[in-house]
Amino acid sequence: MTNSNKLSGKNILITAGAQGIGEAITKHFIDSGANVAIHYFSSADTANELVKYATDKGLKTIAISGDLTKEEDANALVKITVEALGGLNILINNAGSLVARKMLSEMETEFWHKVMDINLTSMMFVTRAAAPYLAKNENSSIVNLASLAGRKGGHPGSLVYATSKGAILTYTRALASELGPQGTRVNAVAPGLILGTSFHNTHTTKESAAETTKGIPIQRAGNADDVARAVLYLASEYDGFITGATLDINGGVYNM
């Protein structure tokens, strides 16, 4: 039996599902026969391409824009998703950003709150809105996107990003305990160096990536598909007794 058998016909919401790791996750769900709601903030063209990709396979799909740091946008996202797909089985909390590198000495209070809102508060907004719908389905699940930076602190200038991603590790465990009785599993993935994404294209130099790759035991950086496959595993019913866990996807390196 394959993952596609477990995911076929399931209704999935992926935040930031039209770029980088999120785009790969969306494609893998579509290829597994799942119906998808694709949230995006600015990647409208890619979102529409993904909608066509899913529609051509006979799947239900919708692309929804929104600023998830706004409570009303998060609530609307979930409402529109449920109306379009007919329910919700799986939530993928992928939205997040480093925004910029800033050391503590140059950290403005406004910037701190901005990154925390993008990475953490928005996740709470969407999850809070989605939880009652997830409760209506057996074996529902949530997968949160954390980061190796949340375990190790990240590179210089990652203070608020790493802090927010570290909070997601605890958020995942706490939520697993809270939502377990309703039948919803909650897990996370913590990617390491994942190249070919806008995140690292923007915030990681080629020299830094090459130096980091030297320290990875399997001698290569990760890619978006590496993360997507792990997300689909945790989202599926195959891990029915795994909840509150964080799966590290970093090639065996823990000192980035």
Features from the language model and the residues they span:
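Short C-terminal tail/terminal secondary-structure segment
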Residues: T2-S4, L98-R101, L232, T243-M256
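A glycine/serine/threonine-rich, flexible loop-to-helix segment
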Residues: N48, P181, P191-I216
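Substrate-binding pocket helix/loop in short-chain dehydrogenase/reductase
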Residues: K102-L104, F111-K114, H200, S208, ...
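Catalytic Tyr-X3-Lys loop
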Residues: S105-M124, V143, I168, I218
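Active-site helix of classical SDR
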Residues: T127, S164, T172
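Alpha-helical segment proximal to the catalytic Tyr-Lys
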Residues: P132, S177-E178, G240
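Short, small/polar-rich loop/turn modules that mediate ligand/substrate recognition or access, typified
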Residues: N139, G180, R185, I242-G244, ...
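Residue(s) in the substrate-gating loop at a strand-loop-helix junction
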Residues: S147
